[in-house]
C-alpha cells in the first residue's frame, strides 16, 4: 500500500492513540505516538463524552463499520440474554465472516478480507458466501476457492500475519491448503486491543 493509502488509517489510529489491527499495516504509532496536530507527548484533557466517543470509535474503526451498521449490531446485542450487551456485541463482531477471514490469517486487514469475501473467494462449509456481514457459527469450516490460495491478498497475509490465531479458532493444512474453524464463542478478550466496555455502554445509553 502506498503512503497516501495508509495515511488516513494511520491518522485515525494516532488520534485514538491505539493500534487497530483490523485497519491493516502495523506501525501507526511508531514514529508519532500522539494525535495529528499535536507536537510531542503533551497531556490531553478529556471530557467524559470524548472518552466515551473514542472507545466506541476504536471498535467501529477496527471492524470497519459505518455508524448505522454498528448501531444495528448494538440493537441486536441488546436483545441477547447476555448480562453485558457489549460482550454480546463483541461476540457478533468477531463472528462476522470478514473478521473471521482476517483472524484466520487469510488476509492482513478486515478490508482486504471483505474484498476476498465480496469477490466470491471464500467458502463456508464448502459453499460460496459473498456477504462479509454473515455471522459464522461454532463448527463452521472456512476455506478459500482453490485459485484464491494463490491470491496476492492471501499470500501477503500468510507471509506476515497481522495477528496470532485467537484461542477460539483453529486452523489446519489439508492437502497444502489452509482451512479454519470457529471452535468457541468469542468474548470481550477477543478484541485485539485495550478498550473500556463501560465507556461504550455510557456513550449509547445517552443516545438510545
From Swiss-Prot:
- Tell me one GO biological process term: ribosomal small subunit biogenesis
Q: Which GO terms describe its cellular component?
A: small ribosomal subunit
Identify the domain of life: Bacteria
User: Could you tell me which CDD domains the record lists for this protein?
Assistant: S4
Q: Which UniProt keywords apply?
A: Ribonucleoprotein, Ribosomal protein, RNA-binding, rRNA-binding
Xref: Pfam families:
Ribosomal_S4 (PF00163), S4 (PF01479)
InterPro entries to which the protein is assigned, alphabetical: Ribosomal_uS4 (IPR022801), Ribosomal_uS4_bac-type (IPR005709), Ribosomal_uS4_CS (IPR018079), Ribosomal_uS4_N (IPR001912), S4_RNA-bd (IPR002942), S4_RNA-bd_sf (IPR036986)
Signal sequence, renumbered to the chain:
none
RNA-binding keyword on record: yes
The record places domain S4 RNA-binding at: 95-160
Molecular function GO terms recorded: rRNA binding; structural constituent of ribosome
Q: What does this protein do?
A: One of the primary rRNA binding proteins, it binds directly to 16S rRNA where it nucleates assembly of the body of the 30S subunit.
Assembly notes: Part of the 30S ribosomal subunit. Contacts protein S5. The interaction surface between S4 and S5 is involved in control of translational fidelity.
Q: Which family does it belong to?
A: Belongs to the universal ribosomal protein uS4 family.
UniProt protein name = Small ribosomal subunit protein uS4B
Amino acid at each position: 500500500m502506498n503512503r497516501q493509502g495508509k495515511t488516513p488509517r494511520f491518522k485515525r489510529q494516532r488520534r485514538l492513540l491505539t493500534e487497530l489491527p483490523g485497519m491493516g499495516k502495523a506501525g501507526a504509532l511508531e514514529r508519532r505516538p500522539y494525535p495529528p496536530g499535536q507536537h510531542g507527548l503533551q497531556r490531553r484533557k478529556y471530557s467524559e463524552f470524548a472518552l466515551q466517543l473514542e472507545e466506541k470509535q476504536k471498535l467501529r474503526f477496527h471492524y470497519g463499520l459505518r455508524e448505522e451498521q454498528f448501531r444495528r449490531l448494538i440493537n441486536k446485542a441488546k436483545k441477547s440474554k447476555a448480562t453485558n450487551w457489549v460482550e454480546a456485541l463483541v461476540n457478533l463482531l468477531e463472528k462476522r465472516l470478514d473478521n473471521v477471514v482476517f483472524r484466520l490469517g487469510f488476509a492482513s486487514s478486515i478490508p482486504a478480507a471483505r474484498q476476498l469475501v465480496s469477490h466470491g473467494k471464500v467458502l463456508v462449509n464448502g459453499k460460496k458466501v459473498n456477504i462479509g456481514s454473515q455471522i459464522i457459527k461454532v463448527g463452521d469450516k472456512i476455506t478459500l476457492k482453490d485459485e484464491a490460495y494463490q491470491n496476492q491478498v492471501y499470500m501477503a497475509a500468510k507471509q506476515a500475519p497481522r495477528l496470532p490465531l485467537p484461542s477460539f479458532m483453529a486452523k489446519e493444512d489439508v492437502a497444502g491448503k489452509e482451512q479454519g474453524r470457529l471452535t468457541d464463542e468469542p468474548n470481550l478478550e477477543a478484541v485485539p486491543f485495550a478498550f473500556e466496555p463501560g465507556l461504550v455502554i455510557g456513550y449509547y445509553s445517552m443516545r438510545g
